[in-house]
UniProtKB/Swiss-Prot annotation:
UniProt similarity note: Belongs to the FMN-dependent alpha-hydroxy acid dehydrogenase family.
Protein name as it appears in the record: L-lactate dehydrogenase
Residues in FMN hydroxy acid dehydrogenase domain copies: 1-380
Keyword NAD: no
Residues of the active site: 275 (proton acceptor)
Residues given in the record as FMN binding sites: 106, 127, 155, 251, 306-330
Function text: Catalyzes the conversion of L-lactate to pyruvate. Is coupled to the respiratory chain.
Domain of life: Bacteria
Amino acid sequence: MIIASANDYREAARRRVPPFMFHYADGGSFSERTLARNVSDLADLALRQRVLKDMSQLNTEIELFGEKLAMPIVLAPVGALGMYARRGEVQAAQAAENKGLPFTLSTVSVCPIEEVTPAIKRPMWYQLYVLKDRGFMKSVLERAKAAGCSTLVFTVDMPTPGARYRDLHSGMSGKYKEIRRVLQAMTHPRWAWDVGINGKPHTLGNVSGYTGKSVGLDDYAVWLADNFDPSISWKDLEWIRDFWDGPMVIKGILDVEDAKDAVRFGADGIVVSNHGGRQLDGALSSAKALPSIADAVKGEIKILADSGIRNGLDVVRMIALGADATLIGRAFVYALSAAGRAGVENMLDIFRKEMHVAMTLTSNARISDINRDALVDLTKI
């Protein structure tokens, strides 16, 4: 099929990977209303076209936490990437590095830290959940430091897992999930060969390295559910702040007061995020939450945003709303699923071209030039 956008990669991914894996990435929680609003609320923001400005020196580069980024995009932490393409975390990290961007490794990755970092020269970011097993948290932080990871992304919006009904329908969870997955793999032979056979081991590499025993896909949801800590508070994060030498980013902020707490805590950055609509259905979209948060803490802390970004125009919209940079998740997972590293690299090229068009036609030659004057809220016209 012809690939022209992230939406095309979504369709290509739907065809290539088994339903239980596709819908795990594609779906949200409960009725998926927040998942839908993440996209629609961005689409409701028209870009204000301005003309006859000199755009010959247009530049998408930024600096973030001492790193140069070719554009204000970071590949977000996504669990089990190695189930979408053979050793998927390695391929995604290499694609990001080749395009001048950071890659964030998830706590629940298939490939462990020690497999991904030797495959790239650029320091990657590492994502950590709040878990009951503090021994695991300390161990994996030590491993991340030893491997040269530059930035810690601390996810705080999962004290309990969201109810993802689509997973019950797809075979990711629920009754007879094992046999359903086998049958699905049989009808997706390219995935079965590339990932199912040649992509082994299918374990949570970072977790298995700590426990000393294999923690596989069937153990994934159980391990997470058993280890999420609903008692967590800001005080519990203090030892992590003291232990980690580099920048620390708090991911999962949707409220102004929480953003202010992050500043008081001493975080270097926040991610305005509703976990891609995968946690609290009914929560604000990131596009709706971002402006008030930016008004409250911009300049005191770096603001990143995710959830709902499907193209380069959406990146420009998030920057205009007050973000310093963005994270993208589903868009690169679709591309990775469809075409591996080459797919992710091509998708990032598409995003860059879309950003160039948007910046040129809104007369913003630098990322720092973009502000809310570039937007028109269609719901208020």
